[in-house]
Structures are given as structure tokens and as C-alpha cells.
């Protein structure tokens, strides 16, 4: 939700990003602080200290974005170890139905999926830990989705799960899907290399020693 600022009032410093735990362990829905005035809008989309306080991996190595037309479906993508990564995804234009699939053997939600409505209007994002497949369906276009990931792209480790093989309800019978995504392996045939570690989900990061 935007905070409206009048012409005669200076913009206040951004407040903290709000984190809400999702059903899949280690996943969070984020709400960015946003301010709007007669010039436009100001949004804070990352705050390292807020991630570190929750023990969330946030040493992002790459940032990229996709621009997609309406009814385009991308997914379900991930990289296998040792090039796996955590991911932060959000819209700066349009809106999407974002989808995550838990591939971590031993997780209480292994094989289950969860969807999130993300949009530039909502100023929200989703954080996904390692071991989850990710994809989305465009609801309103043009949709520009930004990704920040904790490992660089590695073609040898880049793969995915077929979008219609794990029981998700996309509410669209014939989305626009790439040839690559149509031939990804179905979930029931995927032998997961990911293992669930509850310590990595809930353990806060140690406090940094002050600089001398």
C-alpha cells in the first residue's frame, strides 16, 4: 500500500519491510514500504539487515528481470546443487500468480505447492530458500518480474519441473509456454537432490562483530 505524500511535505525515511511466513518452510511474503507523491513513487525493495535478522540467505550474486505478455507461464525453474540458490522475486509492472513447489526431501511440505499474488500495485515480493521450484502466470500485462538470486546462472545446473505435473491450479487451460518448459521432467519422475534442513530455515545468523 502506498503512503501518499503532499507537495509541501518531505518524504520520510522508509519504514521496515514486512515479512509474513508462508506455509512452505523458509518461504516469506514481503511487503515493501512505498511512498507516492505528485512526482511518482518511491519503493524500498531490499534491506540486508532485515533478512539477516531472520537468518535468510541474501548474498545475491545476480539480478535480472523478465517482461511477459498476458497469459504467459514461466516455470517451474531451479538450479540443482552446487549451483542452487535462494531467490527474491517481485513485480515492478503488472501482476502475476507466483508459484513455489517444495522439492526438499524430508520437508513437511515436500511435493506441495503454494501460490502468491504479486503485483506492482501491492508492492510485495516472495522469498524462496534453496530447494524450491519457481514459476508464475501473468495476470496483468505487461508484467516485469525482477529476480535476485544467490548464485550465478549455470546452464549445466539449470533445470525445472513441468508446470502441469504437480497438481497446481493455474486457472487457465492453455497458457503461453515455451518449448523448453513444455518438455521439462514431470514431478513424479524427478529424483530430488535437495534435502530439508530445519536449522537452515529457522536459525538466525550470528551478529557481526563491530569494526575495529
Stretch-by-stretch model annotation:
Residues 121-123, 130-149:
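Ligand-binding loop in jelly-roll beta-barrel domains
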Residues 2-121, 140-142, 152-212:
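Non-catalytic, conserved peripheral segments adjacent to functional cores
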Amino acid at each position: 500500500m502506498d503512503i501518499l505524500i503532499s507537495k509541501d511535505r518531505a518524504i520520510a525515511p522508509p519504514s521496515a519491510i514486512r515479512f509474513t511466513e508462508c506455509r512452505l518452510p523458509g518461504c516469506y511474503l514481503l511487503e515493501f514500504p512505498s511512498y507516492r507523491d505528485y512526482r511518482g513513487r518511491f519503493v524500498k525493495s531490499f534491506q540486508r539487515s532485515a533478512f539477516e535478522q531472520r537468518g535468510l540467505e541474501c548474498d545475491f550474486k545476480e539480478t535480472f528481470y523478465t517482461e511477459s505478455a498476458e497469459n504467459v507461464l514461466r516455470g517451474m525453474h531451479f538450479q540443482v546443487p552446487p549451483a542452487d540458490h535462494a531467490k527474491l522475486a517481485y513485480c515492478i509492472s503488472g501482476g502475476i500468480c507466483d508459484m513455489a513447489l517444495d522439492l526438499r526431501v524430508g520437508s513437511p511440505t515436500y511435493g506441495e505447492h503454494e501460490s502468491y499474488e504479486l503485483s506492482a500495485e501491492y508492492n510485495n515480493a516472495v522469498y524462496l530458500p534453496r530447494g524450491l521450484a519457481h514459476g508464475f502466470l501473468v495476470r496483468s500485462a505487461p508484467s516485469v518480474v525482477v529476480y535476485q538470486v544467490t548464485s550465478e546462472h549455470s546452464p549445466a545446473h539449470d533445470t525445472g519441473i513441468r508446470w502441469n505435473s504437480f497438481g497446481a491450479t493455474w486457472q487457465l487451460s492453455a497458457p503461453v509456454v515455451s518449448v523448453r518448459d513444455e518438455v521439462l521432467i514431470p514431478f513424479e519422475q524427478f529424483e530430488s537432490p535437495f534435502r530439508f534442513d530445519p536449522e537452515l530455515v529457522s536459525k538466525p545468523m550470528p551478529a557481526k562483530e563491530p569494526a575495529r
